[in-house]
A protein has these predicted regions:
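Juxtamembrane regions of bacterial inner-membrane/periplasmic proteins
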Residues: 1-198
């Protein structure tokens, strides 16, 4: 390739990159993130020592107690990340290798064998309510990239810990820990309450 050809290819790739960024910014403006109200959640009446005395579901009848990663057992968080998304702190919201693996296994076995969703993609599905379809997965990918562009990894992990479904009307690790184990998530050990029940 000549110098003029290289120069032309660089110009085209730069233009394509600029158009891609402009399109992504336009999509971000047109389809804002459906972030939950930070004040939403169940009302919990606490004793002086922090023990819940009485809890009330939110307006939708969902039991959800707000929590932060540091309020959850580090063993639980470690087990969650190991089981659900061991590359959470290294990928931009989407793990193309996990998606390729899941697609390859589905083709070979003619059924869904493993998922390719990252923790961020799961948060996107929880917040956006995307359907289980090819279009839904594409939308999940776009929302995951959007989440990663707007929020820190800690904020994404917090959304997951607050919003992950644990059966029925129980959402979030803190509400599930109280409902199933009768103790706060900070005292929940990984072996007693595994991410697999998600």
């Amino acid at each position: 390739m000549t110098f003029a050809g290289v120069k032309k290819a660089l110009r085209w790739s730069g233009t394509l990159m600029l158009l891609t960024v402009a399109f992504a910014l336009l999509l971000d403006r047109l389809l804002p993130l459906p972030l939950p109200d930070p004040t939403g959640g169940s009302t919990v009446v606490l004793a002086r020592d922090g023990t819940p005395l009485r809890a009330f579901p939110d307006d939708d009848g969902v039991w959800r107690y707000p929590t932060k990663p540091e309020d959850v057992s580090p063993l639980y968080v470690e087990a969650l990340l190991t089981y659900e998304d061991r590359w959470f702190y290294k990928h931009p919201g989407v793990n193309p290798f996990a998606i390729a693996r899941a697609v390859g296994q589905a083709i070979v076995h003619r059924r869904l064998v493993s998922g390719g969703s990252t923790l961020t993609m799961q948060v996107a599905r929880i917040l956006d309510g995307t359907p289980h379809s090819a279009f839904g997965k594409l939308r999940q990918v776009l929302r995951a990239l959007q989440l990663e562009a707007h929020l820190s990894k800690r904020e994404i992990l917090t959304l997951y810990l607050d919003r992950a479904p644990f059966g029925g009307t129980i959402e979030g690790v803190e509400a599930a820990s109280w409902a199933y184990l009768g103790k706060p998530a900070a005292r929940t050990i990984a072996s007693g309450f595994t991410p697999g029940c998600l």
